[in-house]
Amino acid sequence: MNRLLVACAALIALVSGGAQSDPLAARSKGRPDAPITLYEMSDFQCPYCRAFALGTMPVLEQEYIGTGKVRLVYINLPLTSLHPNARAAAQVALCAARQDRFWAMHDLLFRHQDEWAKLPKPSGVLLALGDSAHLDHAALDACVTANATAPEVDADAARARRAGAVSTPTFYIEGGLLEGAAPVTVFRAVLDSIYRAKTGR
């Protein structure tokens, strides 16, 4: 059941050694100064995360992210005991972020989840999806082979758990947790209430 919980601790922003002034920018949607920040703690192999990404998220993009009300930030929480390929997918997605193509890869990973989720070695399919996302193949291959983004995935997962996330998807919204792939009506109720409280509108 979806429920709103008061989190014990705030989600700590990622620390990155990259050159970006905002290390979360490559995997964020919406204005950096939006009044609400929505952290999505997700697993690329999770079917409920897929349902959110392909069903609910496009509506939120149109009604909240695109209108400047909400900034959405994707945080990796691969539940590898249930989803053994989730970590590989997360690393590929963050490699794509280094080419400013995180969201293209994000969408392809979820749309084609059935094609790679149960493979004993998913790297071939994941790299092929990178080609579909118009990534530099050699750079992506090098990033994946070197496990270059593994520390970022570990940092994401640690911070998600520190915020109180134990399942996916979990959403951290201004001090509270919304668990599960809630219908868009639940997101509207929560986001509208917070937006009114913060802006008076």
Question: Predicted segment positions?
Answer:
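Structural alpha/beta surface segment adjacent to cysteine/selenocysteine redox centers
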Residues: 34, 42-131, 163-166, 192-201
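A short beta-strand-turn-helix
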Residues: 21-36, 64
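C-terminal cap of thioredoxin/glutaredoxin-like
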Residues: 4-5, 41-43, 54-57, 127-201
